Amino acid sequence: MPKQKTHRGLAKRVKRTGGGGLKRGRAFTSHRFHGKTKKQRRQLRKASMVAKGDYKRIRQQLARMK
């Protein structure tokens, strides 16, 4: 059986945290900021954690990621 490979596109978009979670960037941050409030823009600057349901789904894709 072939080796499980890390999904490289996903590996470039997330970082594993010390506690084993996955940190990701946020969507809606590339353009069209005039339609967003100052509060939204400020909150979009922060990184976010991958949700529990998504983590279960993508765990296989990151099998060999450190």
Swiss-Prot record:
Residues 1-53 are annotated as: Disordered. Keywords: Ribonucleoprotein, Ribosomal protein. The keyword Disulfide bond does not apply. The keyword Transport does not apply. GO terms for biological process: translation. Residues 1-16, 23-45 have a biased composition (Basic residues). It holds the Pfam family Ribosomal_L35p. GO terms for molecular function: structural constituent of ribosome. One of its GO terms (cellular component) is cytosolic large ribosomal subunit. Belongs to the bacterial ribosomal protein bL35 family. This is Large ribosomal subunit protein bL35. It comes from Enterococcus faecalis (strain ATCC 700802 / V583). The lineage of its organism: Bacteria, Bacillati, Bacillota, Bacilli, Lactobacillales.
